[in-house]
Amino acid sequence: MYALGTHLLIELKNCNPEILKDLESVKNILVDAAKKANATIISVNFHEFNPFGISGVVVIAESHLTIHTWPEYGFAAVDVFTCGETIKPEIAAQYIIEAFECKVPSIVEMKRGIISHRNEKLPHKVCHEELQVVY
């Protein structure tokens, strides 16, 4: 089945807590992951909580990468959602796992936007004039 996007739900257990609590490190890891996956970065926004924990998003032309960290548990929840054929979400995921020194990662892959009942390949972006119902 063809889908509009691929969504990787990544659980990172037993990570290096020093990395998970460092705002610049977390931000750089997600930005670098987007670049390594061949994504086009649109904007970056991260927030550091008191006493610890970071949430952030890297908005890409092809969708987004998000993270929420719990350094006190050595845990992070990461989403890598991508659309189109030029971006490689699995490359981003592998880089993130390695960069956080994660010892127990797990990844669930979901295909998003399975809207064609004819199992036909769908274009990633279409012009407004080209929009049509595909089912």
Curated annotation (Swiss-Prot):
Molecular function (Gene Ontology), one example: adenosylmethionine decarboxylase activity
GO CC terms: cytosol
Known partners and oligomeric status: Heterotetramer of two alpha and two beta chains arranged as a dimer of alpha/beta heterodimers.
Alphabetical UniProt keywords: Autocatalytic cleavage, Decarboxylase, Lyase, Polyamine biosynthesis, Pyruvate, S-adenosyl-L-methionine, Schiff base, Spermidine biosynthesis, Zymogen
Pathway: Amine and polyamine biosynthesis; S-adenosylmethioninamine biosynthesis; S-adenosylmethioninamine from S-adenosyl-L-methionine: step 1/1
Site for Cleavage (non-hydrolytic), residues: 62-63
EC identifiers of the protein: 4.1.1.50
Gene this chain is encoded by: speH
GO process terms (BP): spermidine biosynthetic process
Superkingdom of the source species: Bacteria
Protein name: S-adenosylmethionine decarboxylase proenzyme
Key word S-adenosyl-L-methionine present: yes
Native source species: Thermodesulfovibrio yellowstonii (strain ATCC 51303 / DSM 11347 / YP87)
Entry keyword annotation includes Protease: no
Class of this enzyme: lyase
InterPro entries given in the database record: AdoMetDC_C, AdoMetDC_fam_prok, AdoMetDC_N, S-AdoMet_deCO2ase_core, S-AdoMet_deCOase_pro-enz
Cofactor stoichiometry and binding remark: Binds 1 pyruvoyl group covalently per subunit.
UniProt-listed SUPFAM superfamilies: S-adenosylmethionine decarboxylase
Cofactor: pyruvate
